[in-house]
Curated annotation (Swiss-Prot):
This is Circumsporozoite protein. InterPro entries: Crcmsprzoite, TSP1_rpt, TSP1_rpt_sf. It comes from Plasmodium cynomolgi (strain Gombak). Its main location: membrane. It is a lipid-anchor; GPI-anchor. A lipid is attached at residue 378 (GPI-anchor amidated cysteine). Residues 379-401 form a propeptide. It is found in: Cell membrane; Cytoplasm. Residues 98-278 are annotated as: 17 X 11 AA tandem repeats of [DG]-G-A-A-A-A-G-G-G-G-N. Residues 91-95 are annotated as: Region I. Essential sporozoite protein. In the mosquito vector, required for sporozoite development in the oocyst, migration through the vector hemolymph and entry into the vector salivary glands. In the vertebrate host, required for sporozoite migration through the host dermis and infection of host hepatocytes. Binds to highly sulfated heparan sulfate proteoglycans (HSPGs) on the surface of host hepatocytes. GO terms for cellular component: cell surface; cytoplasm; plasma membrane; side of membrane.
Length: 401
């Protein structure tokens, strides 16, 4: 019986001495976590998709004939060919306002055409429009224009356009629809010239002011070949809000076109656009157009509180430093002292080089370098001690029995 007890106790102690090989002292929490990961994190959606595929394949196998499927394929192909193709829509463009834009001209409040710049709106080839669109060779304001002439507020006279009623030969009208060959303002365009809210002259239309031969001016004077807005115009182009360039410029100068709220080669609004003007009001800016970068868009701003101060966690406790200094003051040198603890987080310190020759009693916190120390092998120490005790007990039992 004694031998049996000795054998049992010895086997238990030996098993505990080698926990990793014999399966004792296993961390069951890890096993539980692994089981949870295995069974809880299953993607149920994949099962649903598999069931759908299986049911589809079963239905095709039971109720359908693959030959019939092949016979239906040419029919479907013919149906696809017969179906009219849906025209592509440019989702970036804004809907036209207060009228329509004509081919060869500029749309209102949004659209831009190559070769000219519109003011606060669209641009058409060859000239600049006011507060809206520009027409080829001239600009129309606040309305509609017809080819060769436009009517204001609805009516148009053949061979000329009237503003708020009357039409002039070779000019464009306002407040209406747009015709081929020119662009209207706020909706319409006129071929050969445009007039705005004022009088129209033969060969051109004037906007709120005077008009020059060959073009229409808005809110000021107009020059031949283009329309100007709210400013002066130079020969061969119309200027808006100030300066004008050859071919017509709005709110800036552009060679061969009018620019709005800025300068552009070919016309630009609220920036620069080559070959056309962008409407700053409608926001329909397209590349290559110069836009203004919004605040915070160009670069990433490091927000307040993003940087974390990790040094605060490593600052030792002043009280702990003082107590430890009192204990090791006489033996403290320029080398790091032992950590204050044998397990967990503690503090260690050493003298600064400048305080190497100071007497121990003269040392203070300013003469020391301190840092937090961490002892991570606490469990290993306890395991060594416990295993040593077990080995001693085993030897005692073996020797005295």
């Amino acid at each position: 019986m004694k031998n049996f007890n000795l054998l049992a106790v010895s086997s238990i102690l030996l098993v505990d001495l080698f926990p990793t090989h014999c399966g004792h002292n296993v961390d069951f929490s890890r096993g539980i976590n692994l089981n949870g990961v295995s069974f809880n994190n299953v993607d149920a959606s994949s099962h649903g998709a598999e069931q759908v595929r299986q049911s589809a394949s079963r239905g095709r196998g039971l109720g359908e004939n693959p030959k019939d499927e092949g016979a239906d394929k040419p029919k479907k192909k013919d149906e696809k060919q017969v179906e009219p193709k849906k025209p592509r829509e440019n989702k970036l463009k804004q809907p036209r306002e207060d009228g329509a834009a004509a081919a060869g001209g500029g749309g209102n409040d949004g659209a831009a055409a190559a070769g000219g710049g519109g003011n606060d709106g669209a641009a058409a080839a060859g000239g600049g429009g006011n507060d809206g669109a520009a027409a080829a060779g001239g600009g129309g304001n606040d309305g509609a224009a017809a080819a060769g002439g436009g009517g204001n507020d609805g009516a148009a006279a053949a061979g000329g356009g009237g503003n708020d009623g009357a039409a002039a030969a070779g000019g464009g009208g306002n407040d209406g629809a747009a015709a081929a060959g020119g662009g209207g303002n706020d909706g319409a365009a006129a071929a050969g010239g445009g007039g705005n809210d004022g009088a129209a002259a033969a060969g051109g239309g004037g906007n709120d002011g005077a008009a020059a031969a060959g073009g229409g001016g808005n809110g000021g004077a107009a020059a031949a070949g283009g329309g100007g807005n709210d400013g002066a115009a130079a020969a061969g182009g119309g200027g808006n809000d100030g300066a004008a360039a050859a071919g017509g410029g709005n709110g800036g100068a552009a060679a061969g076109g009018g620019g709005n709220g800025g300068a552009a080669a070919g016309g630009g609004n609220g920036g620069a656009a080559a070959g056309g003007g962008n409407n700053a009001r409608a926001g329909d800016q397209q590349p290559p157009a110069g836009g203004n970068k919004k605040a915070g868009e160009a670069g990433g701003n490091a927000g307040a509180g993003q940087a974390q101060n990790n040094e605060a966690a490593n600052v030792p406790n002043a009280k702990l430093v003082k107590e430890y200094l009192d204990k090791i003051r006489s033996t403290l040198g320029v080398e790091w002292s032992p950590c204050t603890v044998t397990c967990g987080k503690g503090v260690r310190m050493r003298r600064k080089v400048s305080a190497a020759n100071k007497k121990p009693e003269e040392l203070d916190a300013n003469d020391l370098e301190t840092e937090v120390c961490t002892m991570d092998k606490c469990a290993g120490i306890f395991n060594v001690v416990s295993n040593s005790l077990r080995l001693v007990i085993l030897l005692v039992l073996a020797l005295f029995n």
